[in-house]
């Protein structure tokens, strides 16, 4: 088997669409920010994207709304999510949509664990294994995981326990059909009065607002609650009259009290890494610089 791989020097949505159109690309690995850019692009109709037959999403949780949007844009393509990390192979699970005999995919599912590995979910505080459908830290064990971090025994010891389980730092759960669902990064969870709030969940809701083209959620220190969720949003062209209260009310109607957005900051663009991941540390720095001590 053989295939041609197209590489882009940097991401630009119109360049991506033009490459697919020109070269009749068939397989597209994407991350959620690229899915967002595709779904929000006003120029999508200018390109023939019918050659796409497989869309694989990874790198971060893909919200149901974005997943549904992508399916609508590419009705003839197989769409699924996968999960993995460099330290472990890297592929750990893959959507059942890509199986030899495809199975209907549940929204948000990342598929089942690969055959040469074991997976379990543990309580991040106690290390005890958790039952199905209960969120905790994802742990993986198998011959494919790394031996350790080069010249960093301390980091290796924190990551791989005495029984050989690699603690991924990701929060997720396994359902009754052995499928994995990702919630968020453990270190990204916002701790509000003992409750845990996943930024990815709020970001997915924010992106359903018709006036928001991009969004990110990070914690802000709060004397009473410990931490509260705050949002950085990019407003779509033509909606400059959008207010902070409008966005806060939009979220409040859909979530329990401890997940409500405390503040909204308007920004020109969400800072992201070359792979499309949100640079949350940059946003936390903006908060530290703008909020009075």
Swiss-Prot record:
Keyword Ligase in annotation: yes
Top EC class of this enzyme: ligase
Pfam family, one: AMP-binding
GO BP annotation list: phenylpropanoid metabolic process
Residues bound to CoA: 10, 193-194
Binding positions for ATP per the UniProt entry: 81-82, 86, 170, 185, 277
Annotated stretches, region: SBD2: 82-149
GO terms assigned for molecular function: 4-coumarate-CoA ligase activity; ATP binding; CoA-ligase activity
Entry binding sites for (E)-4-coumaroyl-AMP: 59, 81-82, 86, 94, 187, 191
EC annotation from Swiss-Prot or TrEMBL: 6.2.1.12
Pathway in which the depicted protein is active: Phytoalexin biosynthesis; 3,4',5-trihydroxystilbene biosynthesis; 3,4',5-trihydroxystilbene from trans-4-coumarate: step 1/2
Annotated stretches, region: SBD1: 12-81
Reaction catalysed by this enzyme: (E)-4-coumarate + ATP + CoA = (E)-4-coumaroyl-CoA + AMP + diphosphate; (E)-4-coumarate + ATP + H(+) = (E)-4-coumaroyl-AMP + diphosphate; (E)-4-coumaroyl-AMP + CoA = (E)-4-coumaroyl-CoA + AMP + H(+)
Cofactor(s) named in the record: Mg(2+)
Superkingdom to which the source organism belongs: Eukaryota
Keyword annotations from UniProtKB, A to Z: ATP-binding, Ligase, Nucleotide-binding, Phenylpropanoid metabolism
Function: Carboxylate--CoA ligase that may use 4-coumarate as substrate. Follows a two-step reaction mechanism, wherein the carboxylate substrate first undergoes adenylation by ATP, followed by a thioesterification in the presence of CoA to yield the final CoA thioester.
UniProt comment concerning the protein's domains: Both substrate-binding domains (SBD1 and SBD2) are involved in the substrate recognition, and are sufficient to confer the substrate specificity.
Family stated for the protein in its record: Belongs to the ATP-dependent AMP-binding enzyme family.
Name by which UniProt lists this protein: 4-coumarate--CoA ligase 1
Protein species of origin: Glycine max
Lineage, broadest ranks: Eukaryota, Viridiplantae, Streptophyta, Embryophyta, Tracheophyta
